Amino acid sequence: MSEQKPVQWASKIGFVMAAAGSAIGLGAIWKFPYVAGTNGGGAFFLIFVLFTILLGYPLLVGEFIFGRRNQTNAIDAYKKEAPRSAWFLTGWIGVAACFLVLSFYSVIGGWILLYIVKTASGSLSGLSQAQYGALFASIIQNPVQTLAAQLVFMALTVLVVARGVQKGIERVSAVMMPILFLLFILLVLRSLTLNGAMEGVKFLLVPHFGDLTPESILFALGQAFFTLTLGVSVMVTYSSYLPKTQNIPRSAASIVLMNIIVTLLAGLAIFPAVFSFGFQPNEGPTLLFTVLPAVFEQLPFGTLFFIGFLVAFLFAALTSAFSMVEIIVATIGKGDEKKRKKLSWTSGLLIFLVGIPCCLSYGVLSDVHLFGKTFFDIADFTVSNVLMPSGALLISLFIPLKISKSELLAEMRNGSNAGKAFFYTWFYLLRFIVPLAIIIVFLNLIGILSF
């Protein structure tokens, strides 16, 4: 029996698009606008960019090197580098995090789908902001609608992953990502033509460091790691499909740049319009579902532009979801592509079932609390405050401790001409600065360190 040919990306740009799609998820569009809006706007954005470049980029390069070097799923990669040790549990942390993330991430994906349908049908027209708020509450409290939408979102995700890395994830990401960028550019151009739009631009881009607090700086630090899908071995899995000719430092830089650009475009699409019509930029997570519909309502062809925004939002959610299912399939399937379809659908079904309590947290289970939190909040807290930071810390410690500098340099130079100055700057950032930053974020998230 002939051995299966190892799975690889069909092209260099295909990998970049898929990895960027994984990184550019709801964090850049769903979370950043309201976090920036409540933490000083331009000052927060500047700090976020600096942290992304100085801390997120080194860890992303490290995950790429580690993944490509071992050419296998994350758990087996740890076992190859550190046999007969417990380091492989770091890979399982990533698998557990992705499974749990998607259990509530798919709920938000379902909300987006419902909003697209309702906007296209005209159900979201002619309402005030208060009415949009009431409508959003009624939507997320409806168990039948939200569960059906969550199921559709998971089905769309699994349909792509089941087709494989090249024919599924890469091909679809290569279509969705350019469309996402194009939609955001059109939305930004429209938003910037509004009266008073420059107030929103100033809010986003002009730093007011007096508005920064230690808490908001830590927020920016956390955003720099988590918006790149770091710490959950997704990038280790994706890079395991890379050929040795791929320029890792350049690919990582492209992904970081694309993530920053989309974050900037999301801000420029939202804040000028919000300021133009006198709304508050610090409305919280409901900004996208209650404030923006009211803003677009007042624009010529506003419904069309809002649908464009929702489609971009959906594409960002889906391309991230692909990577989360892929790490589960890669781990359990161990490279056996014959098992891919079955594993994809089984994983998707289990994620949906685990996500049911999260989906119902705003409806029939809204009064059910554990440790003072709903099921949705527990899943979010566990991933954001425990699994992702601990996974990122362990990966940042593992790579420079368990792989020699000479081996890391040799792997980095496969496909690139990275000099020693670049390498040693990257290495010492990864070995010392990145773990320290993650520890600070982690201690703050669990309440041990506060300012």
From Swiss-Prot:
The protein's location, in the record's own words, is: Cell membrane
Q: Is Translocase among the key words of this record?
A: no
Q: Record's GO cellular component, any one?
A: plasma membrane
Q: Which CDD domains match?
A: SLC6sbd_Tyt1-Like
Task: Give the way it sits in the membrane.
Answer: Multi-pass membrane protein
- What species is given as this protein's source? Bacillus subtilis (strain 168)
Q: Where are the transmembrane segments?
A: 13-33, 41-61, 97-117, 142-162, 174-194, 217-237, 255-275, 299-319, 345-365, 381-401, 429-449
Give an example GO molecular function: symporter activity
* Function in brief: Putative sodium-dependent transporter.
Family of the protein in this entry: Belongs to the sodium:neurotransmitter symporter (SNF) (TC 2.A.22) family.
Coiled-coil residue windows: none
What does the UniProt keyword field contain? Answer: Cell membrane, Membrane, Symport, Transmembrane, Transmembrane helix, Transport
- Which Pfam families is this protein grouped with? SNF (PF00209)
> Does Transmembrane count among this protein's keywords?
yes
| UniProt-recorded name of the protein | Uncharacterized sodium-dependent transporter YhdH
Return the InterPro entries for the record: Na/ntran_symport (IPR000175), SNS_sf (IPR037272), YocR/YhdH-like (IPR047218)
Identify the PROSITE patterns for this entry: NA_NEUROTRAN_SYMP_1, NA_NEUROTRAN_SYMP_3
